[in-house]
């Protein structure tokens, strides 16, 4: 983000307007935050970067910047307007034309359109990115051309905004063409500065677009006219897109890609359909074949045919190189949009070098914009950067590597923007940019990269792509042969050289220059990764696939893709959701950037081009869902065509798209299958093809798939997924996204992903059905088939994912994920799914894919990730690995798919605001998993794929290398990724926000790690630990299947463990650790700012969750100051998200890697220990570099592969310890991966960052907010976990169980050490890991022990929570390493995945709380907290912990759920101890945690708090969880009762039953049980049973906790909030709730009921102790003497009376609300008289009461002064009635502040009650004293206002303050004692101020005769000392500073009461 920010800064204007574009929708939600964040970061540029990168949130800020920029460039206004347009949606884009109507503005609107649309879609992820990037002007023109790409707007635009953007662009294009020409010329003339500044996006876009537009309009007059015609469609599309995600992006992108989109739309439209098809096919082909694209582009430019694009691209590349500095952005755009570039190349270079709108437009236009659009779209996305980068590819990439670095970064940014745009929609692209909110990362990354930000973007992208670049580089170097082989054969043309060059040179270049890396990694990730990787993976296939998909998909998908990208699922599948995502989401969806940005990102990167293609391909075929299936096939078909084949195929399919969507889809499917066969060799092919396609498709698929929900999803996802991986990415993503996402994620995630990617969604369905069905059978063919076939991919990928476990896990997990995520993202489920998922994956891929097969896929992934957020960087890491692995093998692919799914999910989580939170949690979890998968996969699978699935050592080395170097080079790249990524992702990820940071960073490593960890957590989140790497790899293993698993484990043992562990540790450290978490945190913050909470990118989705999250995020925003803190927050937030994601992912991961992964993991652990070591060392050192917290931990990375896991585990182990899961996980995991994985999500922040960061965050961030955030995140994570686990619990957990046991064995081997490690979390973590390293033998030994009997044993133990807890404790203590580990593993596996995450989250919260409470303040404490608290936890958990847990749970629930500061604080206080209990108790308390999680999560924004608890309860049913997940999506719901009432209850219940918590953990375990078959039901039952018991204990807890944590009571009281009405009547029934309403900016109005009815009743029934009531004092009250004075009871309001009087206070004679004294409480009747009153108050009274209650509550809350006052008062009065003291004390806190004080007695509380219960809103004075008000100050005048009401002569009304300050008045059990006496005395007392009778306050000074009414005392300026309710007249007032001298204070109570008594 910083990078982006800087980029943003660089492109402030550009980014600015993108922000605006973005801001409108998602950015509107995001924008404020993002704008703030980005503005914070980029200032104007930051805003711009915000716009681009953080377009979502920053967009608005960027809008401001854009406004500034707008002035800078007319276009910027357009941008701003456009931003709003893009933000406002597609239609706005069209409107924007007018809006942007400034001469430059219309041009800018889409030149601006491209730039603005682009730029705004920088906002649109593409345009702005392009604007940001190279020269958005040129490339935004190209963006316009690439609009198609960039937008998969063309995708989106195709469906919604195929023309949407184009239409806009058309209309806009015409306007803009003229204006854009002006603008472009203008901008182009001022191109460098302007484009870079405002003009870069604008200029580039404007310039290009005029060129494009003029060209397109003139050249492609038909097309452009079509575009214009389509512009109408654009508006339709806009509407559609508006509905869908498309609207923002298409608009943004439409403008940006209007030429293209026009063309594209034309593509979508019939005219361009054919034309675009041809062109696009070529363009896409070119894009697909990066070689082709330049040619195609060039030719297109020249011949306006796809070939021209290639040449053009080549030309462009040179030109880009020529223009690099000038066009660095532009060329980045060029690179980003090869078509754009090509056009830019020609446009820029030869023909109109960017200045000739005609030329450029012609270039686009000739291609009919579809082609260039496709080309551009794909080129930018997949081909643009890769096209330029790949085509001239290497030229461009290399060239871009140098200049294009910025250019390429821009391209990457643009591409990701493109990708996101397509993915999201063009608009989502905008959103990708905005969503780049997530887009912030991706787009700002891309965008910011534009000019100078190019560097930043490059850095950001580099950070995002560093892994990619490093991966790419390493991969290029290591995999260069593979890449070249894969790429070259596949992309024999330029893809070969480009890919190789790009892969080799460019990655190196990129590595050389962060920018280059970013460009290559980011851009290249987008282009290189997408194109290059696709090509590398797919060979040219990727390119061709991309092209094909871009062309065909983009074309066909142009509409659908646009819709898809706009999230046709959103539109189609979930138009509402998508619209939610799209409308608000597409633009906002980026906000909700879950799916959107994901797609955005994905789309942005390759998704744009690939998805543009895929989307388009899919759009043609994917327009229909059936078509989508075809499209997936089509998407994958190009891959199967083979690189060249696909290239030509792309050309063909591109022409096909109109009708070839299905054909394409089928071809893709066929080719995919065939090509997939080639696929692995041409894995990149398949992946690249599908990857490209997938990438394109996701862009498109999101559009297309969104449009054609299923098929497109499958296609899009697979394309995105398959394409994403560019086969690894595309494959994994295609597979993973398509399959994994479809399968694992989509099942869980289909809705979300489908909606997000529609392709994804499509695939989720497929995943659900097909994946599951074809799953096993296709496992073998999955690699070949799945990858090639997106649809098949889904199925095959499922098969590949193969492992049924994985598949099932994916299915189970993902299905729930999908639905859940979808639900989570329900607001913008698709958006969530697609964008985030897509993005994280692409990003991840981009990060990792650069490494390997994933590189192409990675491109996608990365692109997605990039777009999604910089998080996608992490995501890319994750994704790439997954994709690479996925690419490598079916299993790998499956794993990768799973990963992708998780990534998708994660991405989903990432981008979707609230949805994002969910999705992000998922997505991030998924991303981590996916990243892990992808990294693992990429590392293992990719290398395996390329090297052979079984070449693990090489693979490992490669993978390690690549994982390390490329994906983060496992360790290196992880670190590199994190180091740079951290550095950059910090900016980058910050851009996207937490999602970004987390996803990007963690997404990269952490994400992957988290994914793994989450998966580990999720499924045996633990079980993944031992092979934490194996497990981490397990998913990968599953990806790689056995061989790959072996490989995977081998690589991932080293890589998995080092990568997963170290990587994850690193990632963790990063993900949760500083850079990532920081990024995430910061990014999240920024995102949160614009996205609400990155944590809950649901901001986006849900306001409530947003509020909470926003609060949390705002909290985190504070820490955002420090990257680490941010990371910590991110970790806290992200971990939760990640955890949730991870949990979600966990099962799939566990599932896949369960079977083979365990063995492989073990073997790998043993065999790969050294590689792991090396990697771990790398990781360790890098981690150390990256994260401070991880330093000590990271020192051990080299120690062992286990240690890495342990390091990671340590990292999060200590946090986990804090979490209890961490402990369990750490203990359990020795399976470093598992713990790491599990912890990454949860404890990464805990340990690495968490320890430090959390601590710091807590310090920096408000403890409560941190807690809450942690809790929210955790809860979300837990919920996700629960959901995912539940969904995948059965299948995945079974696999996981086995795997978990294996893992456990492995982990257990490490566990004792890890326990030690945990004990010595920071330093020893590594040491333990070293031991763990040593424990490979141990691992093998332990596995049988733990692996074998562990399941049942663990189940039993889990069932018997004490065992688990104790085991966990022992484990933590290293006492029962095996048993404990088993228990821990199972508990953590079950619990941590479900509750574990929650536990971790709770622990996190606890940690935060503890740290805040300074219980866990010290890192050692945290770590020790894990160790100590864990053992202590076990014991405490059962004993005091039970209460503490209850309290903690309650507090946590309250904190997360209610999040009342008090509750949080109380929770914090409680939590530390409780947490200590919880870390271990986390296992036991997992269920409670889960429930708190669920409940908290609901508040957190996990919609299905209850659902989750239910899901956890009903863990036996995946469906149950799935529904729960679906329930979850309504995160918005969370604020409601669940958060308060149910969550607490459930949490407390479960917490109370620490043992029940294990059952909740059992949901994860249930899958294990499921594996066993029987245990699961038992667990469920037990869990439910436990929950039930928990419910009972909860009450006890409430009682016990009542004193400890009052916040709990409010929830309890909430039940009675409405009861007072009826009860006020009867003495016993007269319950006066004292409600304290505090307006929390974070939470909104927080209502705290101070006194529960029970309390009152118990007091009345003295037999009962009042302890039940909140305060123990009631019991004391009972035991102690009550006031001897008579008491009054509140009675019904008199509705009929012969006496009419003024309703005034009986003490002061003033009316209600007099001087802000609040409402009057009453009516109170003398006890004798009250008995005569009717028991049932008249209805009027009830209404009055209600109204009064409302008013009073406010008054009370506002007026509630200090508890101390009341406490003092109570203490003072306790003499008279001690029991009252406590009661009033609680009420006292609610005492009205206005009153400044109240009667000294507790009556203050009572008045509140009175007011609440009785409440005539009219002024109240005692009946008998109606005249008092008249004489009161202002009496006559005011008195006139006092209504005359029928009053009873015996009814008394009082002000809270008057009663509080009156002497001897007490409120006990609803009875007001002493009022009559006080009144009698007062009647004789004359006020010294107003001279009226009724004075109740006397000066405290002896001998002073001044008496006052309470209000008069205030008026007289008396000193009212609330501590003892003493009054000092003005004469005796002490000096101002000292209200009451200490002496007086001491005597105040006694003296005061004495004095008062005397007075009385």
UniProtKB/Swiss-Prot annotation:
Tissue distribution of the protein: Expressed in most tissues, except in ovary and prostate. Isoform 1 is exclusively expressed in brain, heart and testis, and this form predominates in liver and kidney. Isoform 2 predominates in lung.
Motif Nuclear localization signal positions after renumbering to this chain: 1254-1268, 1576-1600, 1785-1792
GO MF assignments: DNA binding; RNA binding; zinc ion binding
Gly residues composition bias: residue spans: 42-60
Compositional bias (Pro residues): 1555-1566
Effect of residue 1942 to H: In DDVIBA; uncertain significance
Mapped zinc finger ranges (PHD-type): 1885-1933
Annotated region (Disordered), positions in chain: 1-287, 305-328, 360-392, 476-748, 920-1037, 1110-1142, 1162-1285, 1303-1331, 1384-1607, 1660-1683, 1732-1839, 1939-1960
Location of N6-acetyllysine modifications: 602
Domain of life: Eukaryota
Residues joined by cross-link Glycyl lysine isopeptide (Lys-Gly) (interchain with G-Cter in SUMO1): 929
GO annotation, biological process: positive regulation of transcription by RNA polymerase II; regulation of transcription by RNA polymerase II
Ranges of biased composition (kind: Polar residues): 1-18, 122-131, 193-219, 260-270, 277-287, 497-508, 537-547, 693-702, 936-945, 1464-1477, 1944-1960
Variant or mutagenesis effect after changing residue 512 to E: In DDVIBA; uncertain significance
Ranges annotated as DNA-binding: 1537-1551
Residues with PTM Omega-N-methylarginine: 60, 1024
Basic and acidic residues composition-biased segments: 616-628, 732-748, 946-961, 1130-1142, 1304-1318, 1424-1451
Pfam families per the UniProt record, alphabetical: zf-HC5HC2H (PF13771)
Chain intervals annotated as zinc finger (C2HC pre-PHD-type): 1829-1865
SMART domains according to UniProt: PHD
Function: Transcriptional activator that binds to the regulatory region of MMP3 and thereby controls stromelysin expression. It stimulates the activity of various transcriptional activators such as JUN, SP1, PAX6 and ETS1, suggesting a function as a coactivator.
Illness association: Developmental delay with variable intellectual impairment and behavioral abnormalities: An autosomal dominant disorder characterized by impaired intellectual development with speech difficulties, dysmorphic features, and behavioral abnormalities including autism spectrum disorder, attention deficit and hyperactivity. Additional variable features may include hypotonia, somatic overgrowth, macrocephaly, mild distal skeletal anomalies, sleep disturbances, movement disorders, and gastrointestinal issues, such as constipation.
Protein name: Transcription factor 20
Organism: Homo sapiens
């Amino acid at each position: 983000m910083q990078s982006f920010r800087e980029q943003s800064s660089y492109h402030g204007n550009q980014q600015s307007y993108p922000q605006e574009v973005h801001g409108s929708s998602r950015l509107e939600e995001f924008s404020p935050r993002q704008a703030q964040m980005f503005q914070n970061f980029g200032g104007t540029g930051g805003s711009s970067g915000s716009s681009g990168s953080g377009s979502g949130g920053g967009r608005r800020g960027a809008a401001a910047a854009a406004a500034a920029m707008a002035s800078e460039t007319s276009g910027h206004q357009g941008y701003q307007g456009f931003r709003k347009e893009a933000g406002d949606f597609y239609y706005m884009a069209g409107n924007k034309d007018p809006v942007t109507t400034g001469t430059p503005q219309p041009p800018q609107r889409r030149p601006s359109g491209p730039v603005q649309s682009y730029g705004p879609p920088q906002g649109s992820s593409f345009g702005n990115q392009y604007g940001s990037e190279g020269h958005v002007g040129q490339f935004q023109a190209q963006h316009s051309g690439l609009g198609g790409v960039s937008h998969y707007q063309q995708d989106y635009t195709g469906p919604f905004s195929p023309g949407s953007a184009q239409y806009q662009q058309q209309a806009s294009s015409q306007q803009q063409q003229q204006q854009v020409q002006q603008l472009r010329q203008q901008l182009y003339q001022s191109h460098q500065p302007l484009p870079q500044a405002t003009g870069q996006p604008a200029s580039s876009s404007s310039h290009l677009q005029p060129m494009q537009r003029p060209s397109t309009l003139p050249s492609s007059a038909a097309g452009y006219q079509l575009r214009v015609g389509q512009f109408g469609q654009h508006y339709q599309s806009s509407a559609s897109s508006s509905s869908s995600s498309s609207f923002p992006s298409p608009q943004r992108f439409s403008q940006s890609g209007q030429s293209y989109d026009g063309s594209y739309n034309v593509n979508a439209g019939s005219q361009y359909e054919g034309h675009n098809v041809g062109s696009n096919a070529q363009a896409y082909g070119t894009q697909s074949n990066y070689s082709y694209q330049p040619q195609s582009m060039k030719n297109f430019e020249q011949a306006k045919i796809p070939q021209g694009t290639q040449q053009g691209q080549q030309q462009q590349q040179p030109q880009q190189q020529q223009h690099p500095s000038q066009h660095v952005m532009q060329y980045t755009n060029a690179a980003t949009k090869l078509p754009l570039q090509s056009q830019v190349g020609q446009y820029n270079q030869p023909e109109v070098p960017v200045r000739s709108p005609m030329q450029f437009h012609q270039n686009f236009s000739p291609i009919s914009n579809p082609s260039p659009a496709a080309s551009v779209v794909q080129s930018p996305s997949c081909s643009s950067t890769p096209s330029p980068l790949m085509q001239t590819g290497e030229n461009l990439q290399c060239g871009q590597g140098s200049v294009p670095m910025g250019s390429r970064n821009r391209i990457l940014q643009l591409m990701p923007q493109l990708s996101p745009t397509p993915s999201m929609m063009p608009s989502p692209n905008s959103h990708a940019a905005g969503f780049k909110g997530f887009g912030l990362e991706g787009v700002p990354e891309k965008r910011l990269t534009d000019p100078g930000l190019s560097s930043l973007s490059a850095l950001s992208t580099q950070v995002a792509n560093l892994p990619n670049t490093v991966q790419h580089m390493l991969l290029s170097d290591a995999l260069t042969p593979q890449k070249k082989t894969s790429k070259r054969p596949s992309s024999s043309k330029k893809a070969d050289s480009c890919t190789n060059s790009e892969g080799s040179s460019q990655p190196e270049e990129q590595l050389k220059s962060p920018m280059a890396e970013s460009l290559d990694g980011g851009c290249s990730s987008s282009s290189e990764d997408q194109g290059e990787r696709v090509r590398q993976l797919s060979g040219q296939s990727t390119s061709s696939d991309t092209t094909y998909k871009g062309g065909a998909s983009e074309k066909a998908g142009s509409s659908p893709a646009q819709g898809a990208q706009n999230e046709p699922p959103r539109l189609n599948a979930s138009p509402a959701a998508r619209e939610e995502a799209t409308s608000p989401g597409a633009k906002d969806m980026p906000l909700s950037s879950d799916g959107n940005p994901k797609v955005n990102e994905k789309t942005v990167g390759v998704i744009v081009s690939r998805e543009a293609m895929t989307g388009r391909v899919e759009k043609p075929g994917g327009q229909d869902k059936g078509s989508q299936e075809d499209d997936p096939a089509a998407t994958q078909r190009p891959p199967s065509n083979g690189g060249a084949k696909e290239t030509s195929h792309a050309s063909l399919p591109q022409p096909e798209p109109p009708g070839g969507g299905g054909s394409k889809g089928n071809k893709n499917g066929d080719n995919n299958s065939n090509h997939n066969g080639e696929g692995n060799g041409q894995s990149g092919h398949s992946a690249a093809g599908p990857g490209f396609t997938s990438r394109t498709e996701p862009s498109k698929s999101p559009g297309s798939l969104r449009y054609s929900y299923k098929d497109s999803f499958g296609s899009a996802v697979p394309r995105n997924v398959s394409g994403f991986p560019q086969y690894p990415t595309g494959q994994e993503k295609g597979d993973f996204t398509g399959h994994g996402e479809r399968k694992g994620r989509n099942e869980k995630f289909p809705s979300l992903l489908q909606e997000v990617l529609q392709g994804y969604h499509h695939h989720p369905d497929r995943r659900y059905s097909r994946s599951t069905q074809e799953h096993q059978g296709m496992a073998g063919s999955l690699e070949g088939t799945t990858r090639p076939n997106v649809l098949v991919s889904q199925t095959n990928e499922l098969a590949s994912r193969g492992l049924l476990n994985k598949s099932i896990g994916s299915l189970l997990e993902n299905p729930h994920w999908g639905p859940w995520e979808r639900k989570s993202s329900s607001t913008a489920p698709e958006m969530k799914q697609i964008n985030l998922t897509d993005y994280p994956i692409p990003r991840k891929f981009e990060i990792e894919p650069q490494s390997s097969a994933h590189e192409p896929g990675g491109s996608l992934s990365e692109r997605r990730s990039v777009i999604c957020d910089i998080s996608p960087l992490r995501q890319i890491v994750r994704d790439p690995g997954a994709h690479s692995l996925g690419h490598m093998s079916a299993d790998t692919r499956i794993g990768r798919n799973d990963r992708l799914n998780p990534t998708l999910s994660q991405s989903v989580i990432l981008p979707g605001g609230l949805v994002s939170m969910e999705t992000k949690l998922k997505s991030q979890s998924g991303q981590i998993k996916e990243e892990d998968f992808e990294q693992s996969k990429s590392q293992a699978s990719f290398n395996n794929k390329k090297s052979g699935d079984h070449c693990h050592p090489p693979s490992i080395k490669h993978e390690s290398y690549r994982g390390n170097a490329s994906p983060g080079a496992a360790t290196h790249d992880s670190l590199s990724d994190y180091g740079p990524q951290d550095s950059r992702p910090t900016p980058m990820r910050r851009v996207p926000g937490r999602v970004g940071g987390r996803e990007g960073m963690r997404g990269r490593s952490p994400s992957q790690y988290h994914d793994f960890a989450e998966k580990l957590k999720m499924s045996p989140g633990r079980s993944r630990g031992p092979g934490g790497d194996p497990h981490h790899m397990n998913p990968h293993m599953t990806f790689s299947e056995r061989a790959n698993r072996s490989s995977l484990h081998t690589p991932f043992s080293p890589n998995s463990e080092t990568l997963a562990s170290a990587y994850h540790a690193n990632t963790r450290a990063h993900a949760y650790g500083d850079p990532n978490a920081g990024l995430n945190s910061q990014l999240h913050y920024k995102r949160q700012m614009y996205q609400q909470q990155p944590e809950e990118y649901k901001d986006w989705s849900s306001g409530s969750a947003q509020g909470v999250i926003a609060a949390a995020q705002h909290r985190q925003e504070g820490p955002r100051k420090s990257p680490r803190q941010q990371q910590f927050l991110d970790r806290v937030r992200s971990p939760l998200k990640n955890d949730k994601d991870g949990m979600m992912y966990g099962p799939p991961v566990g599932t896949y890697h369960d079977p083979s992964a365990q063995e492989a993991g073990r073997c790998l652990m043993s065999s790969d220990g050294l590689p792991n070591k090396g990697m771990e060392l790398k990781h360790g050192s890098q981690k150390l570099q990256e994260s401070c917290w991880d330093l000590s931990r990271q020192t051990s990375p080299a120690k062992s592969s286990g240690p890495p896991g342990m390091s990671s585990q340590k990292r999060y182990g200590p946090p986990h310890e804090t979490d209890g899961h961490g402990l369990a996980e750490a203990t359990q995991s020795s399976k470093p991966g598992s713990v790491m994985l599990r912890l990454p999500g949860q404890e990464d922040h805990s340990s690495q960052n968490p320890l430090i960061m959390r601590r710091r965050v807590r310090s920096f961030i408000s403890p409560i907010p941190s807690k809450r955030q942690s809790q929210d995140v955790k809860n979300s994570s837990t919920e996700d976990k629960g959901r995912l686990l539940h969904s995948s619990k059965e299948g995945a957990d079974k696999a996981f169980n086995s795997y978990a046991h294996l893992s456990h064995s492995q982990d257990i081997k490490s566990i004792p050490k890890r326990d030690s490690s945990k004990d010595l979390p920071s330093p020893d973590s590594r040491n333990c890991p070293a031991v763990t390293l040593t424990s490979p033998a141990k691992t093998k030994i332990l596995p049988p022990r733990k692996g074998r009997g562990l399941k049942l044993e663990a189940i039993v133990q889990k069932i018997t929570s004490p065992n688990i807890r104790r085991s966990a404790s022992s484990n933590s203590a290293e006492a029962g390493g095996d048993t404990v580990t088993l228990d821990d593993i199972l508990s953590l596996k079950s619990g941590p995945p479900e509750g574990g995450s929650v536990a971790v989250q709770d622990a996190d919260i606890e940690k935060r709380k503890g740290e805040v409470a300074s219980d866990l303040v010290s890192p050692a404490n945290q770590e020790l907290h894990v160790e100590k608290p864990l053992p202590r936890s076990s014991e405490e958990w059962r004993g005091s912990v039970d209460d503490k847990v209850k309290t903690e749970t309650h507090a946590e629930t309250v904190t997360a759920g209610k999040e009342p500061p008090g509750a949080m604080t109380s929770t914090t206080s409680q939590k530390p101890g409780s947490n200590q209990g919880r870390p271990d108790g986390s296992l036991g308390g997992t269920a409670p945690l889960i429930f708190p999680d669920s409940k908290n999560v609901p508040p957190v924004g996990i919609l299905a708090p209850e659902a989750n608890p239910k899901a956890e309860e009903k863990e036996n049913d995946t469906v149950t969880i799935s529904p729960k997940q679906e329930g979850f999506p309504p995160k918005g719901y969370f604020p409601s009762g669940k958060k308060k009432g149910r969550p607490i209850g459930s949490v407390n219940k479960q917490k109370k039953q620490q043992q029940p918590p294990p059952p909740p953990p059992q949901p994860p375990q249930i899958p294990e049980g499921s594996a066993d078959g029987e245990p699961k039901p038992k667990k469920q039952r037990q869990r439910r049973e436990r929950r039930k018991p928990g419910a009972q204990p909860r009450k006890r807890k409430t009682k016990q906790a009542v004193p400890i944590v009052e916040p709990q009571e409010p929830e309890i009281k909430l039940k009675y909030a409405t009861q007072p009405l009826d009860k006020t009547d009867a003495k016993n029934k007269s319950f006066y709730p004292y409600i304290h309403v505090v307006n929390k900016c974070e939470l909104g109005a927080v209502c705290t009921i101070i006194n529960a009815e029970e309390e009152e009743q118990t007091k009345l029934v003295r037999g009962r102790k009042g302890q039940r009531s909140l305060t123990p004092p009631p019991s004391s009250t009972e035991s102690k003497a009550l006031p001897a004075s008579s008491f009054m009871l509140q009675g019904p309001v008199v509705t009929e009376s012969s006496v009419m009087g003024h309703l005034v206070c009986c003490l002061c004679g003033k009316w209600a609300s007099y001087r802000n004294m609040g409402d009057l409480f009453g009516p109170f009747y003398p006890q004798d008289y009250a008995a005569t009153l009717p028991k049932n108050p008249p209805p009027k009274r009830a209404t009055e009461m209600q109204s009064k209650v409302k008013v009073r509550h406010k008054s009370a809350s506002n007026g509630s002064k200090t508890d101390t006052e009341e406490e003092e008062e109570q203490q003072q009065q306790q003499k008279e009635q001690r029991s009252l003291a406590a009661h009033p004390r609680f009420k006292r806190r609610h005492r009205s502040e206005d009153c400044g004080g109240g009667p000294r007695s507790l009556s203050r509380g009572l008045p509140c009650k009175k007011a609440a219960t009785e409440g005539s809103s009219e002024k109240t004075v005692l009946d008998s004293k109606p005249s008092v008000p008249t004489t009161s100050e202002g009496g006559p005048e005011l008195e006139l206002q006092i209504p005359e009401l029928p009053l009873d002569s015996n009814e008394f009304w009082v002000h809270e303050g008057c009663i509080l300050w009156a002497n001897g008045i007490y409120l006990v059990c609803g009875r007001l004692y002493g009022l009559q006496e006080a009144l009698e005395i007062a009647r004789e007392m004359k006020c010294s101020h107003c001279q009226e009778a009724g004075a109740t306050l006397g000066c405290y000074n002896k001998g002073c005769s001044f008496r006052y009414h309470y209000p008069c005392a205030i008026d007289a300026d008396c000193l009212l000392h609330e501590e003892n309710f003493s009054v000092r007249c003005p004469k005796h007032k002490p000096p101002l500073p000292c209200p009451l001298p200490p002496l007086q204070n001491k005597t105040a109570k006694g003296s005061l009461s004495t004095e008062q008594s005397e007075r009385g």
